[in-house]
Amino acid sequence: MDEQDILNELREYRNQDLKYEEGYILGSMCTKPHPMARKISEMFFETNLGDPGLFKGTSKLEKEVVSMIGGILHNKNAFGYLISGGTEANLTAMRAFKNISKSKGKPQNIIIPETAHFSFDKAKDMMDLNVVRPPLTKYFTMDVKFIKDYIEDSKNEVSGIVGIAGCTELGSIDNICELSKIAVENDILLHVDAAFGGFVIPFLDDKYKLDGYNYDFDFSLNGVSSITIDPHKMGLAPISAGGILFRDNMFKKYLDVDAPYLTEKQQATIIGTRSGVGVASTWGIMKLLGIDGYETLVNESMEKTMYLVKKAREYGFETAIDPVMNIVALNDENKHDTCMKLRDENWYVSVCRCVDALRIVVMPHLEIEHIDGFLESLSNTKKY
């Protein structure tokens, strides 16, 4: 095949994909990247952060990006990496937890909520972790009292806690402030999965915050050891650009393995070969948008979220919980059936595990007309 024939055939495959701007993707936490990312991607497409000595400029960019993201999370001196996504970030945190607890002679008992991302199921399987699942409150957050009592009764057998800041299904935020206190009092590691919420919560206008809800989640809390945060979600970076940040570089020695044939003799990330595109794109987009740009982005998405909730209620649909961020769960006892009917109309939503509900993520690519069209189709599925 010649080059043009190859490109034409590839274009036919690409045309089978959904496009974010069409508005039919309502269940994804990713969105159309910022347009500048295309130019940056071309500039950095051959870089490999797995061998940083060969790509010194890109490696410097990664350190700068980690510091920039750390600044959002109240710790410019954080240590970490931009990696493939939230799954690798959570696996990395759990690997550090396991190795630290082993060094202290403690069992690998980790408290992880039912609302946690399925990447923690992978961590449990790969690392043979012992997972404790606390009950949930009516707000779909971990029961802090249960955790306190469990740790007290277990006589120092718990080595780590995972809290969620923007759970995948509902957007709920665990009481990280209280979990932080527990972690400090009991010398326990605390990882926060803010893969989605990390680029939402810091920019959320107070008018969208729920009364009595604690939105604190980052390194300003002394007990927080590590945070997952993904620029390729609400950060507008291209896939793949996930982030794992640790409070300081003390954690590095629990991640390093020898890599004698590379320009640096140790490597800490799970994936060895890492493109620099995610790093460079994140750097550029964060520099371009700044705090003001992200505040506008998040609060426009929240405005559309409130519109969706209001219109859904006019159609007779109710939410499982009031939206904590730009994620909406609409109650539906026949969620799987409804999901498939909507797919027949080309609407791609997802379903919640922890409650009978459809899950809609109001990402920046969604417009009001898309929301109106979706709700009309959803209403029509209930007429038959």
From Swiss-Prot:
Pfam families tied to this protein: Pyridoxal_deC
Cleaved signal peptide residues: none
Gene Ontology biological process terms in this record: carboxylic acid metabolic process; coenzyme A biosynthetic process; methanofuran biosynthetic process
Cofactor: pyridoxal 5'-phosphate
Residue stretches spanning the membrane: none
Residue positions, PTM N6-(pyridoxal phosphate)lysine: 233
Top-rank lineage group of the source organism: Archaea
Pathway annotation from the record: Cofactor biosynthesis; methanofuran biosynthesis; Cofactor biosynthesis; coenzyme A biosynthesis
Catalytic activity: L-tyrosine + H(+) = tyramine + CO2; L-aspartate + H(+) = beta-alanine + CO2
One GO molecular-function entry: tyrosine decarboxylase activity
InterPro entries noted in UniProt: GrpII_AminoAcid_Decarb, MfnA, PyrdxlP-dep_de-COase, PyrdxlP-dep_Trfase, PyrdxlP-dep_Trfase_major, PyrdxlP-dep_Trfase_small, Pyridoxal-P_BS
Residue ranges that the Swiss-Prot or TrEMBL entry lists as coiled coil: none
Keywords for this protein: Decarboxylase, Lyase, Pyridoxal phosphate
PROSITE patterns for this protein: DDC_GAD_HDC_YDC
E.C. numbers: 4.1.1.11, 4.1.1.25
Function: Catalyzes the decarboxylation of L-tyrosine to produce tyramine for methanofuran biosynthesis. Can also catalyze the decarboxylation of L-aspartate to produce beta-alanine for coenzyme A (CoA) biosynthesis.
Similarity annotation: Belongs to the group II decarboxylase family. MfnA subfamily.
Alphabetized NCBIfam families for the sequence: tyr_de_CO2_Arch
Name the record gives this protein: Probable L-tyrosine/L-aspartate decarboxylase
Organism (species): Methanococcus maripaludis (strain DSM 14266 / JCM 13030 / NBRC 101832 / S2 / LL)
